[in-house]
Amino acid sequence: MDYWFAEIVTIGNEVLSGKTVNTNASHIGRRLTSLGFTVRRITVVMDDIDEIVSGFREAIDRKPKVIVSSGGLGPTWDDKTAEGLAKALGVNLELNKTAFDMILEKYTKRNIPLTEERKKMAYLPYGAMAVENNEGIAPGIYIYHNNIDILATPGVPREMENVLENFINKMLRNKPNLKYLEDFIYVENVMESALAPYVKELVKKYDIYIKTHPKSYELLRPILEIQIAGSGREEEIKVKIEKVKNELLDAIKKLNGIIRNSL
């Protein structure tokens, strides 16, 4: 398969402590996958400047095509993503006029004064661009560095989703000429362990992703959801998935499995 790697960095103590479920990473992962990227790693770091710098630097060193972060762009003392990204890139923070104008307009419309804490959200790494946030205040941060698209989004889910879409539609440079496709088989009466040798052989033969998801207890009434997925040229990946599906169906038949239309 062709791979256009992507990485996700989540910033927030609340995620590490378990207080907040990392739904942002799930959404970003699904969205990038739908574009043809292969998400290789999700990194979660605390609200600590050194940890944020390390998270970005390590991701950059692995040279993916795109890095998307969420969290840490707000006005409070523990919102440190802009500073961490700047240090990771070896540049200074600067007052970005576009970001400043975006923020000023939103507060002015509500007759709210622009305090230093609110102005903080307009400081971006040197060379970065502000990404419109139509659902909140803090703009996203976009910078193209060493052939990597880097985007920092707010942590509030609806704001993250909006900034991510604005980035994809207007700024993303590295767009894979690939299509992500997947298909599913639902089967009863076949244990995951019994199907495992067939899956292993097909993965090796076709260089494709096959994942069995057990939906019940294996030793009682086994039910499996089988996912077949891959990225590549659309027609090629369609043909490959169809071949894999047919061979899996043959294996399921040998194992006396019962095919279902859905779970």
From Swiss-Prot:
- Disulfide bonds, which pairs? none
**A UniProt-annotated Pfam family:** MoCF_biosynth
Tell me the domain of life: Archaea
Recorded hits in PANTHER family, A to Z, give: NICOTINAMIDE-NUCLEOTIDE AMIDOHYDROLASE PNCC, NMN AMIDOHYDROLASE-LIKE PROTEIN YFAY
Extract the NCBIfam families matched here.
Answer: PRK01215.1
In the record, the note on similarity to other proteins reads: Belongs to the CinA family.
Protein's name in the database: Protein M1627_2099
What is the scientific name of the source organism?
Answer: Saccharolobus islandicus (strain M.16.27)
